[in-house]
Amino acid sequence: MTRSTFYYNRREKSDKWSVERAEVASIFYENCGRYGYRRITSEMRNRGYTINHKTTQKLMKESELKCLVRIKKYRSYKGEIGKVAPNLIVRNFNANKPLQKLATDVTEFSLFGVKRYLSPVFDMFNGEIIHYTLYERPVLDMILEMTKGTIKKIGKNTGAILHSDQGWAYQHKKYQQLLKSNGLRQSMSRKGNCLDNSMMENFFGLLKSELLYLQDFRDVSHFEQELHDYIKYYNEERIKLRLGGKSPIQYR
């Protein structure tokens, strides 16, 4: 083989995946390093590329693109334990239609010497966050406002299930009456069994891994704005493999 042929062949080989490599990098940076090779492969296919996960992984390695997400445990706020509602979910997190099975919980963020408490409602059908409240303290009004916002979105008397742990706020008479008067069915996890509400735990772990642990914030106000932006991104853009490479809202 002549020298010119050798260098031509080497150049052709190195350029074979140049377009795909650029697109992989684009997807990686568009999502702030939150996507690993499997999710990037799914998004590549959404964009019309024929590529398998091994090739994506190779291109990422060559380009030194490493997913920055590491799932970490979190501790949600819980009060006294005392079950007042049955477990209607029983770890059956599958739903045939939107707004049929919902889950909620509270998680705590601690930064700049202060705390914030997030109370979202998660749709088991597609993983969408359909409503949420953010408070400085884990007070009952946070839960009631979250519930009222959820009812406004899904409508009254739908028979939807709203599942939670046995935290004190979910045992409160005002919360129970609000659900009952608007046709929502209350469901509670068993005592000390986090797996009964694992979809919420998974979401909180994802949220903290992809937002809190990846980003620097100027102050609490900056964090709050980024949190709102992240939930919007999560609902509208962040694809899920279990949804066939679609975001929650795209799947709905």
What function would you assign to each model-found segment?
Residues M1-K97, N193, S247-R252:
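Basic, flexible linker segments flanking DNA-binding modules
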Residues F6, V24, I40, T56, ...:
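Mobile genetic element proteins and their domesticated derivatives, centered on retroelements
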Residues R91, A95-I130, R137-P138:
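An active-site-proximal beta-strand-loop segment
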Residues K173, K180-L184, L206-R252:
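C-terminal domain-tail junction helix/linker
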Residues E12-D15, K78-E80, S164-Q166, H172-K173, ...:
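RNase H-like two-metal-ion nuclease catalytic core shared by retroviral integrases
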Residues Y7, E128-Y132, Q186-S189, Y213-L214:
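Short small-residue beta-strand/loop micro-motif enriched in glycine and branched aliphatics
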Residues T133-G155, I161:
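Active-site beta-loop-alpha junctions of metal-dependent nucleic acid enzymes
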